[in-house]
UniProtKB/Swiss-Prot annotation:
Positions that bind UDP-N-acetyl-alpha-D-glucosamine: Q45, W46, F47, Y69, Y216, L217, D218, M219, S319, S324, S325, W326
Lineage of the species this protein comes from: Bacteria, Pseudomonadati, Pseudomonadota, Gammaproteobacteria, Enterobacterales
Catalytic residues (positions): E250
UniProt-recorded name of the protein: Protein-arginine N-acetylglucosaminyltransferase NleB2
Gene Ontology biological process terms in this record: symbiont-mediated suppression of host NF-kappaB cascade
Motif (DXD motif): 218-220
Protein source organism: Escherichia coli O157:H7
């Protein structure tokens, strides 16, 4: 059961000074606190909608006094020198910008650039036409008084307009240049977890095994020391924002102890079943809640305490104090 030590940080998962608790409970079920060890790789993400805003030979990651994101990553690489540090990137980068990325890899032995287009995410894809078709069939099976004729007509019209070349959920998000683009591929990267480091031609990935976990951090997270060994309920935990007397699950820091974590697969199933699914609210939030049997009858604050990833050596979500770098 949950030990008193674990409650020090809002039931967070950063107990590294003593032997780990064995289990923690939520909604009447016990979950093993699984290990994310000191070799688990750290993944950052930078999807750049405007690469032209950088200098010709500059690494295309924001690095200003207000938003020192590249510095935060290189600082993490120095502190966590025994971990691989991945930077998952996407954008219309120039040859010179890709050269700058390569130089960054040479300058830091444990840093890897992982281009989105180099990663095979096809196992997580679904045809848009299949999503539309399933919802249309569900509407048609309803009695007339329960059927939404407006929605049915709209979906049938949009289904006819989907071309073969556009018939892919992943391709649809790859064309976006907004936060949904960022959030969707973050979810897929975390499904891959440590295996995403094996999706490059870089030989630095030799120490990462199939099925390994991953620690994801937004670039506004500042490391002040090593993370050590971390424990998480059934191997998954995430940042919880605590402001203005409210709490909310955040996707800015997420840890998983294995690839294809079933809580994230639950979220993917929501993305595969709704035409208007949202990568954050559905793909992460609803999926994690469903996996851990959260219902409106449960206390959301208690669920956030249960799932929270917090750590004394991470200054969390520093961009909340500034305007967005986007």
């Amino acid at each position: 059961m949950l030990s008193p030590i674990r409650t020090t940080f809002h039931n967070s998962v950063n107990i590294v000074q003593s032997s780990p608790c064995q289990t923690v409970s939520f909604a009447g079920k016990e979950y093993e606190l699984k290990v994310i060890d000191e070799k688990t790789p750290i993944l950052f993400q930078w999807f750049e909608p405007n690469p032209e805003r950088y200098k010709k030979d500059e690494v295309p990651i924001v690095n200003t006094k207000q938003h020192p994101y590249l510095d935060n990553v290189t600082n993490a690489a120095r502190i966590e020198s025994d971990r691989m540090i991945g930077i998952f990137v996407d954008g219309d980068f120039s040859v010179n910008q890709k050269t700058a990325f390569s130089k960054l890899e040479r300058d830091f032995e444990n840093v890897m650039i992982i281009y989105r287009e180099d990663v095979d995410f096809s196992m997580y894809d679904r045809k848009l036409s299949d999503i539309y078709h399933d919802i249309i069939c569900e509407q048609r099976l309803r009695t007339e008084d329960k059927r939404d004729e407006y929605l049915l007509n709209l979906l049938e019209k949009e289904l006819r307009e989907i071309s073969k070349a556009q018939d892919s959920l992943i391709s649809m998000y790859a064309k976006k240049r907004n936060h949904a683009w960022f959030d969707f591929f973050r979810n897929l990267a975390l499904l891959k977890a440590g295996e995403i480091f094996r999706c490059t031609y870089n030989t630095k990935n030799h120490g990462i095994s199939f099925g390994e976990g991953c620690i994801y951090l937004d670039m506004d997270m500042i490391l002040t020391g090593k993370l050590g060994t971390i424990y998480a309920p059934d191997g998954i935990s995430m940042h919880v924002d605590r402001r203005n007397d409210s709490v909310n699950i955040e996707n800015s820091a997420i840890i998983v102890n294995r690839s294809n974590h079933p809580a994230l697969l639950e979220g993917l199933s929501f993305m595969h079943s709704k035409v208007d699914a949202h990568p954050y609210y559905d793909g992460l939030g609803k999926g994690v809640k469903k996996y851990f049997n959260f219902t409106p009858l449960h206390n959301y604050n208690h669920f956030c305490d249960f799932i929270e990833f917090n750590h004394p050596n991470i200054i969390m979500n520093t961009s909340q104090y500034t305007c967005s770098s986007w």
